Amino acid sequence: MTGNWLIMEMNGLAQIGILYPQFILSGQWLSQALGSLEEELDRQIYPDGFQYELSTGYADVVINNYQRFIEVAKAFGKTVSEGMLEKLAKACELDVKLMMPDGCVPDINDGKHRNVEETFQCRKRIFPENKTIRWITEKFETGEPDFTSIALPWSGFLVMRTGWTTEDSWALFDAAPFGKAHQHEDKLSLLFYANGKLLLTEGGNYAYDTSEMRRYVLSTRAHNTVRVDAKDQNRLKNYAWKEEDIREKADLKWKLGPVWDYGESNYREGYGENPCPGTVHNRRVFFNKSQKEGKTPFLVVVDRMASDEIHRYEWLWHIDSELEAVQKGRISFHEIDAAFSAEEAEVIEGREEPEWQGFKAVGTKQGMYRKLPCVSIKADAGQIRIVTVLSPCKGLSGRVHKVTASAMPEEDSVVISFEDGTEIAFREQEIIQTV
């Protein structure tokens, strides 16, 4: 037995060893369980605190099982090592690093949109003096993190935010390894929270059944990344977890600054039933936080596709807002604009044929899903560069008129023209070098 199941079993064995001292082997059971629990922390938790399934649901399951053992151990006068407590505290603090402005962690992989304060009210029982936990649960003034945006170098997520209030903006870039279990085919996907809402969302987590909806949420189709020739990413096909993977850093570059945050990664493991690594997707994400002229922070996403053959590329953006207008180079929603340097685009919502597209799970039980607009941008090419701007808006502020950017991969200039007459022009390398 491995993974979170092993931790559950060792939690149970440890508690039996504590609660039933009349059994001759109780001490041996406790010792065996403690040894395994210590080993699994090193085996399953990345140095940045994320459990190796990379799920915001199962990371919590693992911590819960350690906490249940620790509370019983302390109640019966048993010693819990400082090393175990330190590693668990770091794993707990991951929730704050990932936390959206609504106070919840995002639904990553087979994850859960989970309230951090509710979780930490429980965690406080084993970490009563932890400043981060007290900041969340008691509004403890000195516990506020000394960072806003942060990278998780081993688990491969980049969290970009403007601050810690409910009015702030937040974005998540997924450059993660595939993870040990409960994975979705979603490398290079993005989430974006602004104006009090997760505007750029995804399919989410759904019931563990064999339905079309379950297949959809697992697939690239349900995420904000690129498909090739109507085929999804397929890391699962050739995937095998290795023990040393827990110590390997992810393929993630980043820089964080007062005006721009930047992240970059690649997907090169192939698409379709028999994936061949002939197509490389490089994605750069630029998060503008300046809020000049009253604009809400916005995302600039630069994608470069590279192949020796001509392919049909498809960019997907799942927007949780009411559609207003479809125009050349721009699709407007009530709360956000999606502007792009490609020419061909459509909005798909609640489509079941020829394949499911434009849905979002609203729970993990069967039937708990709804329709959701999905922007589909397409281009035929071998080598191509496409720039997409995702700009939240209130009234005229933030409305994008157009994006001007060359399709040549070697070019790096971007010009964003807004409806209010303002313009932002930059070169990718200038931002990367000066952040």
What are these regions (language model features)?
Residues 3, 112, 118-120, 206-435:
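CBM-like, beta-strand-rich accessory domains located in the C-terminal region of large
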Residues 9, 62-65, 222:
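Catalytic-loop motifs flanking and including active-site residues across diverse enzymes
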Residues 46, 50-200, 379-385, 400-435:
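Carbohydrate-active enzyme catalytic cores, enriched for enzymes
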